[in-house]
Amino acid sequence: MAENRESRGTVEAELDPVEYTLRKRLPHRLPRRPNDIYVNMKTDFKAQLARCQKLLDGGARGQNACSEIYIHGLGLAINRAINIALQLQAGSFGSLQVAANTSTVELVDELEPETDSREPLTRIRNNSAIHIRVFRVTPK
């Protein structure tokens, strides 16, 4: 373990912020389904909550209601995704249940050199993710 830390520290020491510009690529997403919600920290919480509620209720006319939705959160947005799922469950009077899965997602960063004398680099890092299934329960 100590060997990994030392070698990683030397790589970090070579990456001077004056010499390289960090460009974070977008995370890889699976093909989007109509009932997938990707939560982020830029969009208003109430708007994201309303969008989830609208999918579950089927809009203003009650058409095309989804029996389940999947809420995805990455990194800092994990807490917001959990909060949205719990708010939906609390407002449903017991008709909705949640099931959560966690995972680790590999993210790729590009390091673009400021000068032509250096080559561009890529760096892979890991980030936590959560995938919450919110579904209707059939009354017994």
Curated annotation (Swiss-Prot):
Main subcellular location of this protein, as a coarse class: nucleus
GO molecular function, one term: ribonuclease P activity
UniProt keyword annotations, A-Z: Cytoplasm, Nucleus, rRNA processing, tRNA processing
Pfam families in alphabetical order: Rpp20 (PF12328)
Family matches, as InterPro entries: Alba-like_dom_sf, Pop7/Rpp20
A single cellular component GO annotation: multimeric ribonuclease P complex
Subcellular location: Nucleus, Nucleolus; Cytoplasm; Cytoplasmic granule
Gene Ontology BP term (one): rRNA processing
Subunit comment: Component of nuclear RNase P and RNase MRP complexes. RNase P consists of a catalytic RNA moiety and 10 different protein chains; POP1, POP4, POP5, POP7, RPP14, RPP21, RPP25, RPP30, RPP38 and RPP40. Within the RNase P complex, POP1, POP7 and RPP25 form the 'finger' subcomplex, POP5, RPP14, RPP40 and homodimeric RPP30 form the 'palm' subcomplex, and RPP21, POP4 and RPP38 form the 'wrist' subcomplex. All subunits of the RNase P complex interact with the catalytic RNA. Several subunits of RNase P are also part of the RNase MRP complex.
Family as reported in the entry's similarity comment: Belongs to the histone-like Alba family.
Function: Component of ribonuclease P, a ribonucleoprotein complex that generates mature tRNA molecules by cleaving their 5'-ends. Also a component of the MRP ribonuclease complex, which cleaves pre-rRNA sequences.
Protein name, per record: Ribonuclease P protein subunit p20
